[in-house]
A protein has these predicted regions:
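Feature marking long nucleic-acid-engaging regions of large polymerase/nuclease enzymes
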Residues: 1-8
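Short, charge/polar-rich alpha-helical segments
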Residues: 16-19
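Duplex nucleic acid-engaging cores and interfaces of nucleic-acid transaction enzymes
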Residues: 12, 22, 26-212
Length: 212
């Protein structure tokens, strides 16, 4: 009714309705994640504040990620082999410590760590999972990806003709690409005509990690 919504047109009303639905979903997800973390006995004031400040569903997923029950991973296998202290040592980035030399202390036939290289690989697996589970890093990487990454696509088979031919050699900044192009590339990939990737300059990604 016009008296209820004034001069707003149908598109504006749909946007308001969509936003309201999203905010309701956001609050519901916050409550669900808070409950799950509480039940696991892992809730802290920092986690609670992070949930309260979260403005997107992806942020909530990032916050919950470290608490989500994990299947067997390379990092969990490395931890079972006693390599967490080695990972912690590497993270300290002490220039006086030689990681290769330090890794020799973790060799164990019983735990099936047979070489320094294997010990270092396990420690790196632990570090990789730690970084991947860090909500603040994931959020910052997402922002940098939106600002600086390229969406690229190429043909799975360059000789094969298809309606996706214009995307056989395609590259465009993520922040500039139109929605219909993203959908077309997604369809082309699902149908097997395209291979798509999001490319981010390695130096920008590393800068985020080192400035955390």
């Amino acid at each position: 009714r016009k008296e209820a919504h004034g001069s707003l047109d149908d598109q504006a009303l749909r946007q308001i309705a969509d936003r309201l639905e999203y905010l309701r979903s956001l609050e519901k997800k916050k409550e669900e994640v808070a409950r799950l973390i509480e039940e696991s006995g892992s809730m802290t004031s920092e986690v609670s504040q992070a949930l309260e400040k979260a403005e997107t569903l992806s942020e909530i997923d990032d916050i919950y990620r470290p608490f989500r029950p994990k299947r067997k991973t390379r990092a969990s296998v490395a931890k079972a082999k006693g390599l967490q202290p080695l990972a912690d040592c590497i993270l300290e980035q002490n220039p006086q410590i030689n990681p290769e030399q330090e890794a020799l202390a973790y060799l164990s036939e019983e735990l099936e760590v047979t070489s320094a290289e294997e010990a270092l690989q396990g420690a790196n697996d632990i570090i990789a999972e730690l970084i991947s589970d860090d909500a603040s890093i994931r959020k910052r990487l997402r922002v940098v990806t939106m600002e600086h990454a390229l969406l690229t696509s190429k043909a799975s088979n360059p000789e094969e003709d298809s309606v996706y031919a214009q995307y056989y050699e395609f590259s465009q900044p993520v922040k500039q690409i139109a929605g219909h192009r993203v959908l077309a590339i997604d369809r082309g990939e699902r149908e097997g005509f395209l291979k798509a990737a999001v490319d981010l300059d390695k130096e920008k990604g590393l800068h985020i990690l080192y400035s955390t």
